[in-house]
Amino acid sequence: MVLNLVLKLTLFLVLEITLKNTMIYTIGGIKGGSGKTTIATNLAIWLAQKGADVLLVDADEQETATDFSAWREQNVGDEIGYTSIKLTGESVRIQVNKLKTKYEHIVIDTGGRDTTSQRAALVISDYYLVPFNPRSFDIWTVYKVQNLVGEIRAVKSEPLHVYTFLNRADPRGADNDEAAEILMQCEGMNYVPSPLGNRKAFSHAAGKGLGIVELNPPDEKASIELNNLFTYIFSNSTN
């Protein structure tokens, strides 16, 4: 009941968003292991379920998003809900610019390093979503991300909206609060107060080639967390 209400409210918010211009999102960061591909694939599926034309670009040399899409096709059939392509280096900027008129949303999954692919993606992106695990080694990289954002904004004519959030958050303990405090203090980056918990549902869904919102029976807590995260970003993107 609660989950259905959340999904309906989310759908309403998304339908309220003006789709006259293609929205481009880069899911990235400086450190690997923060769950970027999980976020990217779930965002692509989440948007596609709202009826949007979505392009998922795998700009990570590990090609995990490409592997997921291939596995998804085997499990759910030819119609996976979005278009998936692989691009690296400057081709990310060049090809996405050529393709953007064909899609309402483009989601770019980049690796956990400061690469040419990630910078090429950021130059053409409207939004930069950066997940952080609430661990010291992960949080320490936020200042490198901040520097990267500053460099991109210095050469980018259009605004780059940056959202940071906690992924794989602990169910309890001080680590979440301490990490959130650091992220909130970073100028030029918006902290999203909707963490994703460290839940088995994400790997369970990926193993079936599904997004969290497609699990049946659903994982209510994971679905609500994901919807809260994306809804927060979308509702603020219209401001």
Give the label of every model feature segment.
Residues 24, 28-30, 34, 45-116, ...:
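P-loop/Walker-type NTP enzyme "switch/lid" segment
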Residues 170, 180-212:
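Beta-strand-loop-alpha "switch" segments that mediate conformational coupling across diverse proteins
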Residues 143-156:
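Conserved C-terminal guanine-recognition region of P-loop GTPase G domains, centered on the G4
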Residues 39:
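Hydrophobic positions on the alpha1 helix immediately C-terminal to the Walker A/P-loop
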Residues 1-26:
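Extreme N-terminal, non-catalytic leader segments
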Residues 203-227:
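Inter-lobe coupling/hinge region of RecA-like P-loop helicase motors
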Residues 117-136:
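Inter-motif core of Ras-like GTPase G domains
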